[in-house]
Amino acid sequence: MKWCWGPVLLIAGATVLMEGLQAAQRACGQRGPGPPKPQEGNTVPGEWPWQASVRRQGAHICSGSLVADTWVLTAAHCFEKAAATELNSWSVVLGSLQREGLSPGAEEVGVAALQLPRAYNHYSQGSDLALLQLAHPTTHTPLCLPQPAHRFPFGASCWATGWDQDTSDAPGTLRNLRLRLISRPTCNCIYNQLHQRHLSNPARPGMLCGGPQPGVQGPCQGDSGGPVLCLEPDGHWVQAGIISFASSCAQEDAPVLLTNTAAHSSWLQARVQGAAFLAQSPETPEMSDEDSCVACGSLRTAGPQAGAPSPWPWEARLMHQGQLACGGALVSEEAVLTAAHCFIGRQAPEEWSVGLGTRPEEWGLKQLILHGAYTHPEGGYDMALLLLAQPVTLGASLRPLCLPYPDHHLPDGERGWVLGRARPGAGISSLQTVPVTLLGPRACSRLHAAPGGDGSPILPGMVCTSAVGELPSCEGLSGAPLVHEVRGTWFLAGLHSFGDACQGPARPAVFTALPAYEDWVSSLDWQVYFAEEPEPEAEPGSCLANISQPTSC
């Protein structure tokens, strides 16, 4: 009968393991003494028993959170310098209200081991988390961790805790800060509205963001690695994120970037013994905050169809003395880009009006700015910027189109879309979308130089298109935008200059290529919406999520 003992022992072991796991889950995430609800400002002793000060040679470097009796979770970038990996110089302080020294009842523990994700390269690239194994167990209550499928309430209030070195109010004292969780797309949208390329799309796969209350300074130096935690309905506090980095101490218009703990839960589960990964109620609804920021190049309706009416919320219809004359693209709250040749001999702003998106009304023009080097379409520089008489309010029916930076790729063979008229000379009701294939200057030059072509030189600042298929009737529209999609974001690739955009490959249409004119546009109106090309999605922690990693990754 000995063969029976194996299964019996396994079942008993599993029972003990399950009981231990359930006990850990009950114990984790229980806030200590203090007000019934967290209050903005200084904490009280023991309020957050898992709060850790990560120190090197006694000086506070980063914050962290106790997630098991021998494990502290913090940020990888705290250990980027070579000297930082000398573990005997590092320690973790638990239970202290002060950034320096030890509060009564605080405990300082040495660090026995450090674990970083293999994919970590730089905090801006993601995977910014680290595990510190303590030299001996501690009795402080740990924070709960989320399962991989955990959904946090975007737009709802969670809390960050840290010492916030830049505050003048009780410097060096542990503080509570209310943060609203912000999804990655919305966070990127907010940062892109700062119109600074080095801050473009900072939230990468495996990140989320947190925004402080209006007028309140967010996490700052020394708060890196600290927890952002949310209260679950069952009363447990769960770590939603790890403070990674911010611009200007996370002001309202520049949220703090967080490592998404749930996105790295599998990595944590494989390494942390004794941590409680809290199961979430399956009834938790999906939550979205997409409506809180209007992103350039975002299309909330069905995509374009050949020959169908335009779905573009950035479409501009230029009316000269009441007649449809040209197309264009809305690129900010008050700017439209179009072709310069539309205005030769008719440059009085009062003669023009602009229809936008799906809105029925029209806007007047305050100013017309033609590129100073423009002489004729075949000579290039066929671009103009129009300033509206009044700024528009962006929303579902009006959104700006993203402008590309000079290194934006417009590869041969890429699918694009243009606007055309269903009938020659027809008005607004005849506008339709036309699918096209992008052609670079070399391929386009060969076709224009071939028999039957017009022999026009194709300059480096141009891009060409060839219509895909045939529509029953179609005529290109001067100044109309050439748009293409990159992983869900739409960009202005070009503005129609000459040639018929409805023609096939024998006579490609020619467009002013927007990547070549970033300097000119920026010099006129820095408020336009430039955007980086979205990078390929990847599993958080994978090498693909960190494109600057060496190939050995």
From Swiss-Prot:
Predominantly detected in testis, liver, heart and ovary, as well as in several tumor cell lines. InterPro entries: Peptidase_S1_PA (IPR009003), Peptidase_S1_PA_chymotrypsin (IPR043504), Peptidase_S1A (IPR001314), Trypsin_dom (IPR001254), TRYPSIN_HIS (IPR018114), TRYPSIN_SER (IPR033116). The active site is at 77 (charge relay system), 128 (charge relay system), 224 (charge relay system), 341 (charge relay system), 382 (charge relay system), 478 (charge relay system). GO terms for biological process: proteolysis. Residues 24-273, 294-526 form the Peptidase S1 domain. Disulfide bonds join 62-78, 158-230, 187-209, 220-249, 326-342, 444-464, 474-502. This is Serine protease 53. It comes from Homo sapiens.
